[in-house]
């Protein structure tokens, strides 16, 4: 099933923002959330959960979404992930994304099953698969975070972030064992194997 506008159309009197995140699982980098308020008169082809789209298709959809819809980004840093835990940091990123919108939504549809104190927020399990607004947000969040990791890769190339985007691939884990963790690694995330915990600062070659 492709995402559709059924929920948005059933709540036609509301200003609805779809929200999704990227980066809950990686060993490095922030968690990034996006909020999107769609213009229902402009439907973009190929809007789906970002995970099922190719990189080129995500980039194409990203350009169309950001040129035609209200959107914003919210970020929770590695330090916040380690301080609060990944769930609370993800919620923080989602809240920030909504606050950063140029338009104030009256209802916020969030992918997943998180609980929020703001009663505008409604969590929808697998929302990125059924809700057009959430799927749009998933694309914006994914492309934004991937681009951030590309930039960080230039400073720390041995970890392969241009390919793994901070996820725990074999290359990434071996690099951590060899070179240690950077300031962009989540020290609260554990995995098997011995690690050199000394932080690596500055450029790496």
Swiss-Prot record:
Entry's family note: Belongs to the RNase HII family.
Give the organism, scientific name: Orientia tsutsugamushi (strain Ikeda) (Rickettsia tsutsugamushi)
Arranged from A to Z, the UniProt key words for this protein are: Cytoplasm, Endonuclease, Hydrolase, Manganese, Metal-binding, Nuclease
Identification of the protein by name = Ribonuclease HII
Give its E.C. classification number. 3.1.26.4
Q: Which NCBIfam families match?
A: PRK00015.1-3
Question: Where, by residue number, does a divalent metal cation bind?
Answer: 20-21, 111
List the catalysed reactions: Endonucleolytic cleavage to 5'-phosphomonoester
Broad EC category: hydrolase
Q: Where in the cell is it found?
A: Cytoplasm
Q: Which cofactors does the annotated protein need, by name?
A: Mn(2+); Mg(2+)
Q: Has keyword Metal-binding? A: yes
Q: Which residues form a coiled coil?
A: none
């Amino acid at each position: 099933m492709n995402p559709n506008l059924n929920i948005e159309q059933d709540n036609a009197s509301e200003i609805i923002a779809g929200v999704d995140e990227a980066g809950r699982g990686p060993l490095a980098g922030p968690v990034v959330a996006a909020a999107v308020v769609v213009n229902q008169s402009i439907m973009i082809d190929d809007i789906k959960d970002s995970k099922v789209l190719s990189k080129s298709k995500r980039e194409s959809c990203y350009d169309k979404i950001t040129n035609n819809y209200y959107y914003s980004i919210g970020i929770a840093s590695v330090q916040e992930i380690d301080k609060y835990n990944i769930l609370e940091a993800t919620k923080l990123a989602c809240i920030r994304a909504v606050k950063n919108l140029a338009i104030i939504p009256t209802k916020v549809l969030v992918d997943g099953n998180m609980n929020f104190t703001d009663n505008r927020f409604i969590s929808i399990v697998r929302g990125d698969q059924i809700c057009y607004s959430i799927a749009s947000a998933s694309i914006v969040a994914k492309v934004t975070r991937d681009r951030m990791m590309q930039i960080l890769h230039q400073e720390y190339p041995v970890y392969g972030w241009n390919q793994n985007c901070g996820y725990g691939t074999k290359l990434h884990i071996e690099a951590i064992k060899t070179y240690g963790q950077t300031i962009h690694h989540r020290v609260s995330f554990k995995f098997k194997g011995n690690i050199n915990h000394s932080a690596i600062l500055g450029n790496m070659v």
